[in-house]
Swiss-Prot record:
Family per record: Belongs to the class-II pyridoxal-phosphate-dependent aminotransferase family.
Keywords for this protein: Amino-acid biosynthesis, Aminotransferase, Histidine biosynthesis, Pyridoxal phosphate, Transferase
InterPro entries in the cross-refs: Aminotrans_II_pyridoxalP_BS (IPR001917), Aminotransferase_I/II_large (IPR004839), HisP_aminotrans (IPR005861), PyrdxlP-dep_Trfase (IPR015424), PyrdxlP-dep_Trfase_major (IPR015421), PyrdxlP-dep_Trfase_small (IPR015422)
Protein name as annotated: Histidinol-phosphate aminotransferase
Organism encoding this protein: Schizosaccharomyces pombe (strain 972 / ATCC 24843)
Keyword Plastid appears in the UniProt entry: no
Gene: his3
Requisite cofactors: pyridoxal 5'-phosphate
Length: 384
């Protein structure tokens, strides 16, 4: 049974957030924040860089809520009070660990193969990482997860990546619910939805945020919106958890240029463009899935079809071969160094022997990719 007051760190619950100048007033003759009154030495599109940005970002949060409430037909609508914003999802991940886990004592649980920053953030915070492998089909092993949570009360956060990275598979909401409803575990379930816009709409855990007080969903503008360069992420969670996370964050963690770009990205016109890009990516994903598996030496797609990338195996022989890390690594390195076509080698991840993670590119990029794979694999098998 989830209890916020015993789940989170006592010192965090007692934290009095820093109150900055812009929490009180943002208009008029502003002589309260020791800013440069004469303005900024640079000027871009009328942005007042000499002023500290809005610490609450209500407009950006509201636009995200409007988008998700409409798309998902959420019965208990999300509001800005459900959101904490961060410098990419990585800041959100770190914040969730810091509010929950006492360094050197508490733990997180994750399910490899998964996003590596969960481990990195945990290690930085001196938090142990407990691992329960995904099933061979990359679904959650719910029984093993629940058993682990039952046995170890030091686990305070469970991280699930959906769609998974590198698996490209969206997790079943029924599995997420079973973990949220664990009868004895007191902790937060985090569902990282960086790639959710490339999957079916009914796969998002956002529909559950106002149903479960122990759920936190991470989203970003980096993927479907094409804004990886501005570094902005969102945690959509219960209002009590969001309040605590907003108390913990740096007072001006989202810059004014980033805020304005995010606001523009969440406008109706930009959302329409996002949908156009997303549809084109999904169309090219279908093409890649079809054509990659016809190339001699390429194995099966072992991941799902819910992201803007594909997880596929490379074989040790052109026909009748087995997944091979040597072949996959050769293909990866030769393409990158000799042909300037860069993918990611993922063969050292659990359940990913001989696997490459390939981002879905434009039609032209994918044509180059397919030709390059054929060429390099021919070279590899000829040399063997």
């Amino acid at each position: 049974m989830f209890d916020l007051n015993t789940c989170l760190r006592k010192n965090i619950l007692e934290l009095q957030p820093y109150r900055c100048a812009r929490d009180d007033f943002s208009e008029g003759v502003l002589l309260d924040a020791n800013e440069c009154a004469y303005g900024s030495v640079i000027s871009v599109d009328g942005v007042e860089f000499n002023r500290y940005p809005d610490p609450r970002q209500i407009e950006v949060k509201q636009r995200l809520c409007d988008l998700r409430n409409k798309e998902l037909s959420i019965t208990k609508p999300l509001t800005p009070d459900n959101i904490c914003m961060g410098v990419g999802s990585d800041e959100i991940i770190d914040s969730l660990i810091r509010i929950s886990c006492i360094p050197g004592k508490d733990k997180i649980l994750m399910c490899p193969p998964s996003y590596g920053m969960y481990t990195v953030s945990a290690k930085i915070n001196d938090v142990e990482v407990v691992k329960v492998l995904l099933e061979p089909d990359f679904n959650l092993n719910v029984d093993a997860i629940c058993e682990t949570l039952s046995k170890d009360s030091a686990i305070k956060v469970f991280f699930a990546c959906s769609p998974g990275n590198p698996t490209a598979k969206a997790l079943k909401l029924e599995d997420i619910k079973k973990i949220l409803e664990h009868p004895t575990w007191n902790g937060i379930v985090v569902v990282d939805e960086a790639y959710i816009d490339f999957s079916a709409p009914d796969m998002s855990a956002l529909t559950l945020v106002n149903e479960y007080p122990n759920l936190a969903v991470c989203q970003t503008l980096s993927k479907s919106f094409g804004l990886a360069g501005i570094r902005i992420g969102f945690c959509l969670t219960s209002k009590p958890i969001a309040t605590i996370m907003n108390s913990l964050k740096a007072p001006y963690n989202i810059s004014e240029p980033t805020s304005r770009l995010a606001l523009d990205a969440l406008s109706p016109q930009s959302i329409d463009k996002m949908h156009t890009y997303r549809d084109a990516i999904i169309q090219q994903r279908v093409r890649l899935c079809k054509e990659l598996t016809t190339i001699k030496g390429m194995g099966k797609i072992i991941g799902g079809y819910d992201a803007n990338f594909i997880l596929i195996q490379v074989l040790d022989r052109p026909e009748g071969g087995k997944p091979s890390n040597d072949a996959a690594k050769y293909l990866y390195l030769q393409m990158a160094t000799m042909h300037k076509v860069v993918v990611r080698f993922r063969g050292t991840e659990p359940l990913c022997e001989g696997a490459l993670r390939i981002t879905v590119g434009t039609e032209e990029e994918n044509t180059i990719l397919l030709k390059t794979i054929k060429l390099v694999l021919q070279e590899y098998y000829t040399k063997k």
